[in-house]
Regions:
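N-terminal capping segment at the start of a domain
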Residues: 32-42
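Intrinsic disorder at enzyme termini
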Residues: 2-21
Length: 218
């Protein structure tokens, strides 16, 4: 077995065994943070502004598609690899790493995490069809996804139905509700709203939870 050359830096996660893919992505994140993010970090903190320039760099480097499966044009990173990359970005710009987490999680919910959820063949086929729509937006358009889940209740933990509802209407869905917080607000291209399907019977059930990717210009 060929011994891998040591990294030229000590990663944020410390001395831990890494695969060749993890080493490559960690190096990419380190160089991006060192050369681009570090010099801008104080500006975002001082102004309380969004790091749009950093997202342009993430997009150009292909890191917005980090956890999109390779079969769908992404880099196919698993959860551990994402953690390593996020930690490395965070050592140079906390603002970017925090908001980046929200975008990446949107691709993981429908990607590697959903792959571990039992589904019937029909459900799996429909899930794969739908998630490809979102993955194409990230891969081809460099789209950024936000996650407005929070409502100040137990809904986000799965212990209650979401107060935000979605009702099927002619031409699509009508979403009605209020979210109290969303990282990437004002910067995302799509907002992944978790809501409860309104079936017209006034009976809300957590099992009727829907994920609605609402365009920013809707």
């Amino acid at each position: 077995m060929t011994e891998q050359a040591p990294l030229s830096f000590t990663p944020a996660v410390g001395d831990t065994p890494l695969t060749a893919k993890q080493r490559r992505l960690l190096t990419l994140a380190h160089e991006l943070g060192r050369d681009k993010f570090a010099g801008r970090a104080a500006l975002w903190d001082r102004e309380g502004s969004f790091p749009f320039a950093n997202y342009d760099d993430l997009r150009e480097a292909g890191l917005l598609r980090l956890c999109v499966p390779e079969a769908d044009g992404g880099l196919g990173a698993d959860y551990a690899t994402y953690m390593f990359v996020a930690a490395e970005l965070g050592r140079f710009c906390g603002t970017t790493a925090l908001t980046y987490n929200m975008h990446i999680c949107s691709t993981m919910w429908t990607g590697v995490l959903a792959d571990g959820i039992p589904m019937s063949d029909q459900e799996r086929s429909e899930h794969l069809r739908r998630r490809q729509i979102h993955f194409e937006r990230v891969v081809k358009d460099g789209a950024v996804y936000a996650q407005p889940f929070s409502e100040g209740s137990a809904a986000a933990a799965g212990r209650a139905p979401f107060g935000t509802t979605a009702r099927k209407v002619e031409g699509g869905w009508r979403i009605n509700g209020r979210k109290i917080f969303a990282s990437l607000a004002g910067a995302a291209n799509y907002y992944g709203v978790l809501c409860t399907e309104d079936k017209g019977d006034d009976k809300r059930d957590a099992r009727d939870t829907l994920y609605m990717a609402v365009p920013a210009d809707a």
